[in-house]
Amino acid sequence: MALWRSSDNLVYLPPTPVSKVISTDDYVTRTNIYYYAGSSRLLTVGHPHYSIPKSSGNKVDVPKVSAFQYRVFRVRLPDPNKFGLPDARIYNPEAERLVWACTGVEVGRGQPLGVGLSGHPLYNKLNDTENSNIAHAENGQDSRDNIAVDYKQTQLCILGCTPPMGEHWGKGTVCARTSSAAGDCPPLELMTTHIEDGDMVDTGYGAMDFAALQVNKSDVPLDICQSTCKYPDYLGMAADPYGDSMFFFLRREQLFARHFFNRAGVVGDKIPDSLYLKGNNGRETPGSAIYSPTPSGSMVTSEAQIFNKPYWLQQAQGHNNGICWANQVFLTVVDTTRSTNMSLCATTESQPLTTYDATKIKEYLRHGEEYDLQFIFQLCKVTLTPEIMAYLHTMNSALLEDWNFGLTLPPSTSLEDTYRFVTSSAITCQKDLAPTEKQDPYAKLNFWDVDLKDRFTLDLSQFPLGRKFLLQIGARRRSVVPSRKRRTTTTAPTPAKRKRSKK
């Protein structure tokens, strides 16, 4: 008897349609009005390796300022809808809203080129494995040494309207079914977080959480042994559907290994016996195979600088072509080619020293940085059609709130309770009440705030970046003061008429 049964093959249904992300060029109209804005000189000074607290209390007296930190500038722009425009007829406030588009940027860096050293007075160094004349040294209780290094060389610039994202390796979670003991290697997890001002860059030792993954505080130099070194998540920011975190980026990295050491300590993962043959004369047991180089960024030169030159944004790599949503720009800068650490000293005596005595002199370290940010912004307008408003609300609902637009919910048909005194202790806690003030989504993050709300100007020719921009677009400046020199007039002699000859 034949028995019919359905096919065992899986039936694949078509995927659900995904809303298409459109480029800002499709709904943002650009005008021919450009503004210049600059921050002037920005300075910061501190200790290059660690922050110094005050003698009384936990407040910081001298901050940590290192060339190997990220500088994340949060540049605040004026609201163009409340801006004094040269022509009020440029847009219709009832059906359009104005936004800024960043078309040019220049990051100015002061101070000379230099190489700054970092290190650790108790660095975990067992043997010099590059020029070793023995198989291994005795792995004593403490063999740490005073080692200094020059870090990896990095120049970086990221521009976007949201904070950049960084990645690093952190300590993961051990599964409950996995047995673990003290001293086992911790599991690793790739973590993605925002890059904040003051976060450490990758110095050549890897992007990782050293405080959680290196308990000896001696495997890396002082300035990162209790910090987290982050590396920009270029893959994640490039895959951002809206392209807000990274319009474009500039990057230059350089590194080589200067010295080769191995680590002191008990080797957690033993070398398999099949990988070596035992010997004599102290070579019965191999030494530590936990090798680690010291990085070096090598020579710094002005010919390889990405700063102090203009960059023009014609087409961003994502869907956001330079539109500064929420009237702000995030500029992330790293420059380790100006990492000079200044050595300062002062005498402990009230009178000037007549002879050198090191016990009467205090030595200090300081690092200073100098920046100058310049921008060219283009005035743009968005036509608020129902389709565009729905798209913007899906992308970022706060934009419509900033433009005094909101969604009106349909009236509820059910009976709801509304208390009068919502803060009274006599009634139940009103947890679902909406906050009265708008919350800053980045309030808990640390950035270098730069306010440019009163620094916009139409006189592009009066500023260095503005003149470079006018040269790019082919504009010619006309002289305001007329020339007093009288033009010389020349008269050409009138040619003599030829007489007709009679035939």
UniProtKB/Swiss-Prot annotation:
From the UniProt record, which GO molecular function terms apply?
structural molecule activity
A Pfam family the protein falls into:
Late_protein_L1
Coiled coil location: none
Tell me the protein family, please.
Belongs to the papillomaviridae L1 protein family.
- GO biological process entries: endocytosis involved in viral entry into host cell; virion attachment to host cell
Keyword Disulfide bond present in the record's keywords: the answer is yes
User: What functional role does this protein have?
Assistant: Forms an icosahedral capsid with a T=7 symmetry and a 50 nm diameter. The capsid is composed of 72 pentamers linked to each other by disulfide bonds and associated with L2 proteins. Binds to heparan sulfate proteoglycans on cell surface of basal layer keratinocytes to provide initial virion attachment. This binding mediates a conformational change in the virus capsid that facilitates efficient infection. The virion enters the host cell via endocytosis. During virus trafficking, L1 protein dissociates from the viral DNA and the genomic DNA is released to the host nucleus.
Give the record's keywords alphabetically: Capsid protein, Disulfide bond, Host nucleus, Host-virus interaction, Late protein, T=7 icosahedral capsid protein, Viral attachment to host cell, Viral penetration into host cytoplasm, Virion, Virus endocytosis by host, Virus entry into host cell
* Organism in which the protein naturally occurs: Human papillomavirus 29
Q: Where is this region: Disordered?
A: 480-503
- Which InterPro entries would you find in this protein's record? Capsid_L1_Papillomavir, Capsid_L1_sf_Papillomavir, dsDNA_vir_gr_I_capsid
This protein's encoding gene: L1
Protein name (record): Major capsid protein L1
Instruction: State its location(s).
Output: Virion; Host nucleus
- SUPFAM superfamilies referenced in this protein's UniProt entry, alphabetically: Group I dsDNA viruses
